[in-house]
């Protein structure tokens, strides 16, 4: 499996570049929704950058989870935390959903679908921003409105450790080497 290890400073720079792409397009979101976990820090950076440029927005993190229903393997998505947005938005508003990667697109599709169902005539204009897009994995007709990189590699974000070998952590996350040596006996 070909992995792409993304460094924290690289992700932050990409987050600001993503915000600039949104700004340059003329889109002015007055709501920004970061998808927990990976989209939250990117959403914060996008919101901060746009705010500096005079685009103020209300912002919140939401969460999704995948679950299985009878006979289906993990195809169902549950969205948590949309109530605040649903109660606040109006049809003339602009909402930007920020995530770390647009993979299958199923989670983003479910978020948008849930917003449209709940908001009905008050559904705002919705756009999606992600630093990474995996077009071959996309199972929806939607692609992100704003993205920086197309890839099919397995992405390893700065906060991710699960599923990595000690060798991978040492090589690609050298700043953790002292901590890894301390915890290695506890998890080996």
Model-derived regions: residue spans:
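PRPP-associated nucleotide enzymes
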Residues: 1-188
């Amino acid at each position: 499996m070909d992995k792409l290890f993304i460094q924290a400073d690289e992700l932050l720079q990409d987050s600001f570049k993503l915000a600039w792409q949104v700004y340059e397009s003329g889109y002015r979101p007055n709501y920004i929704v970061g998808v927990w976990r990976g989209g939250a820090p990117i959403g914060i950076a996008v919101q901060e950058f746009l705010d500096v440029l005079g685009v103020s927005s209300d912002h919140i993190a939401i969460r999704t989870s995948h679950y299985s229903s009878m006979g289906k393997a993990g195809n169902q998505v549950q969205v948590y935390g949309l109530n605040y947005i649903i109660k606040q938005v109006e049809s003339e508003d602009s909402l930007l959903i920020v995530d770390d990667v647009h993979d299958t697109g199923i989670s983003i599709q479910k978020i948008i679908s849930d917003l449209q169902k709940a908001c009905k005539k008050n559904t705002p204009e919705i756009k999606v921003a992600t630093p990474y897009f995996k077009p071959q994995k996309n199972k929806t007709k939607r692609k992100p409105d704003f993205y920086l990189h197309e890839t099919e590699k397995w992405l390893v974000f700065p906060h991710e450790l699960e599923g990595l070998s000690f060798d991978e952590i040492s090589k690609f996350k050298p700043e953790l080497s002292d901590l890894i040596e301390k915890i290695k006996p506890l998890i080996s």
